[in-house]
């Protein structure tokens, strides 16, 4: 255990033991302790850049909005649980609900648990959310907008109405060691924006690594983004594991690396929506996107009868945008149906090389 970790634990223990709500840490920043029943938002509002708001073990009620750069919001592990305020609706609500009142009220009105909220003119940089559970929110467990260098680690996002963890208009994020389970849509959803039609955003190297994504409609959705990595994750029991999605807007989505993931038995059945066919048995799906690298993944036993079913699927875009110059190489695929590799896209330059597989549509891709 390193000295920083020892100092952090000692400070937390001292706060719990003495009953103090805030105390200076060894780094010169303040740790604000919040016990169940106390206001998390009040502690967040009083914190300065570099401070830590530490949530004690137990259940905390209500939504939290973070607008302070450099803030750390940390729990004490999965036993630190954030749930909606008593009486709050658990039905999914549309984006852009009531915006009046305090930031936390706005976050709650949108159906979110923790919001990291910046604006086009004033982003929120360097926020960390760690070591807690967010569950039961109508829309999203954690939602970030205009957040640069956001870190989300060791978070459990479970049974939220739409997304477990979601970002829009954000760059250089790190999502590591999280569990997203049984959320209504994607466990982890990264997009340029969901409200407007815009070209893909360069994320500056966002990393999604070593997460467990299970029982969601889609494990990870990458929508209209460029330049990020999805690596070392375990995805199982979803309707679809990974979606990399673009459309006709420019610049085109792409430059995503999906490598060294375990993608197994994503055979949950999800009905058709207004935007998408029914889903079942989809491993990695590329649609309307370019210059991606899909490599060294283990993709097994994903079985379904949807047009999007299969181990790795390059799918013809619903809006007619082709997928081009995608490299699918050195993956291990077994027991996927209707095939391990599926290409229904007329785009040029997509290559399939060095994959270990038995079946493909069309034939000859293995």
Residue ranges and their predicted role:
Residues 2-5, 14-45:
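Right-handed parallel beta-helix/beta-solenoid
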Residues 30, 51, 62, 69-71, ...:
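The right-handed parallel beta-helix/beta-solenoid scaffold, focusing on the short coil/turn
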Residues 48, 68-69, 77, 119, ...:
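Parallel beta-helix/beta-solenoid
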Residues 54, 65, 74, 83, ...:
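Extracellular beta-strand solenoid repeats
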Residues 88-119, 136-143, 159-168, 183-203, ...:
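Extracellular beta-strand/beta-solenoid scaffold signature
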Residues 320-366:
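Leucine-rich solenoid repeat scaffolds
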């Amino acid at each position: 255990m390193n000295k920083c970790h020892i100092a952090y634990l000692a400070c937390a223990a001292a706060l719990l033991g003495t009953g103090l709500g805030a105390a200076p840490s060894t780094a010169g920043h303040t740790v604000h302790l919040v016990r169940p029943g106390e206001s998390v938002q009040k502690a967040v509002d009083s914190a300065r850049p570099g401070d830590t708001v530490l949530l004690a073990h137990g259940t905390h009620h209500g939504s939290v909005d973070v607008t302070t750069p450099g803030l750390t919001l940390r729990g004490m592990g999965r036993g630190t649980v954030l749930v909606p305020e008593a009486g709050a609706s658990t039905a999914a609500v549309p984006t852009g609900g009531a915006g009046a009142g305090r930031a936390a009220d706005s976050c709650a009105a949108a159906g979110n648990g923790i919001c990291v909220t910046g604006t086009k003119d004033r982003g929120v940089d360097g926020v960390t959310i760690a070591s807690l559970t967010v569950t039961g929110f109508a829309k999203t467990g954690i939602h970030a907008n205009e957040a640069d260098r956001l870190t989300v680690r060791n978070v459990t996002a479970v049974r939220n109405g739409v997304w477990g963890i979601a970002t829009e208009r954000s760059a250089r994020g790190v999502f590591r060691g999280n569990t997203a389970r049984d959320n209504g849509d994607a466990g982890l959803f990264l997009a340029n924006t969901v409200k407007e039609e815009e070209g893909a955003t360069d994320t500056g190297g966002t990393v999604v690594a070593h997460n467990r994504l299970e029982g969601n409609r889609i494990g990870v959705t990458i929508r209209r983004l460029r330049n990020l990595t999805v690596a070392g994750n375990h995805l199982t029991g979803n309707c679809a594991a990974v979606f990399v999605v673009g459309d006709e807007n420019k610049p085109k989505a792409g430059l995503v690396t999906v490598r060294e993931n375990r993608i197994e038995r994503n055979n949950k059945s999800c009905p058709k929506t207004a935007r998408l066919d029914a889903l079942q048995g989809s491993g990695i799906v590329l649609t309307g996107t370019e210059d991606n690298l899909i490599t060294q993944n283990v993709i097994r036993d994903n079985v379904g009868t949807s047009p999007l079913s299969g181990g790795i699927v390059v799918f013809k875009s619903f809006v007619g945008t082709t997928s081009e110059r995608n490299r699918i190489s050195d993956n291990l695929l077994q027991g996927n149906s209707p095939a391990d590799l599926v290409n229904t896209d007329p785009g040029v330059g997509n290559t399939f090389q060095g994959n270990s597989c038995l079946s493909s549509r069309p034939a000859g891709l293995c």
